[in-house]
Amino acid sequence: MHVTSREAVEPFTTKDGSTIRELHHTGSQSLAEATLEPGQATERHYHRRSEEIYVVLEGKGTLEIDGEIREVEPWDAALIPPGSWHQIRAAVPLRFLCCCAPAYSHEDTLFE
């Protein structure tokens, strides 16, 4: 059994300023917690192979997927298909889970 405590994972800051804690990473999937400060947004990007799910835990913001924009709040879950441009922006402090299958990789991620 492999159980990871959030507190045991060292957070890192991405180039767009979001804070990430990668909780699990196998070849077939990955799970990370991401946080954004009010007004902050992830860089608009897509994944060539990975399908991604965002689950909002705390806060509110807007999620854009392929030009469609929607407000998100706690326990909203969004499916982001491979090849879909996406970006999330925090209206207030925002904390969400990111699940990728196959697992997240920098090589699979393309930015504008």
Which ranges hold each PLM region?
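A short, N-terminal "cap"/entry segment at the start of jelly-roll beta-barrel domains
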Residues: 1-30, 109-112
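Conserved short histidine dyad/triad with adjacent acidic residue
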Residues: 32-47
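Histidine-centered metal-chelating micro-motifs
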Residues: 41-43, 78, 82-87
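Glycine- and acidic-residue-biased ligand/ion/polar-headgroup-sensing regions
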Residues: 49-51, 56-61
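A cytosolic small-molecule/anion-sensing beta-strand core signal
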Residues: 57-58, 73-74, 92
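Short acidic-glycine-tyrosine-enriched beta hairpin
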Residues: 68-82
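Ligand-binding loop in jelly-roll beta-barrel domains
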Residues: 82-106
